[in-house]
Curated annotation (Swiss-Prot):
Transmembrane stretches, start-end: 31-51, 59-79
Similarity comment text for this entry: Belongs to the asfivirus EP84R family.
Main localisation: virion
Superkingdom of origin organism: Viruses
Protein name: Transmembrane protein EP84R
GO cellular component: membrane; virion membrane
Keyword Transmembrane among record annotations: yes
Keyword Transport: no
């Protein structure tokens, strides 16, 4: 949606009680995306350590799969916010 930023600015200017939360939500998407990416990197490291050190292969695999899901969600939020 190329016009989403313009609509948000228009709503903020005309109705601040509606527009300001929309503007805050728009900015928080990239912050949430970065947090998801950091958590996914942490899960990757935990999963690799679990897979390499102990015999808990199922737990390590779950951490790696969770990291891929969270990382994909983080990339999606950052991409949608910057487009």
């Amino acid at each position: 949606m190329p016009y989403s930023r313009d609509i948000t600015k228009f709503i903020t200017a005309t109705e601040p009680e509606v527009g300001l939360p929309l503007l805050a939500l728009q900015r928080s998407k990239s912050i949430i995306g970065v947090i998801l990416l950091v958590i996914s990197l942490l899960f990757i490291f935990i999963g690799i350590i679990i897979l390499s050190v102990s015999s808990y292969t199922t737990t390590g695999s779950i951490f790696v799969v969770l990291s891929l899901i969270l990382g994909g969600g983080g990339f999606f939020l950052i991409y949608k916010d910057n487009s």
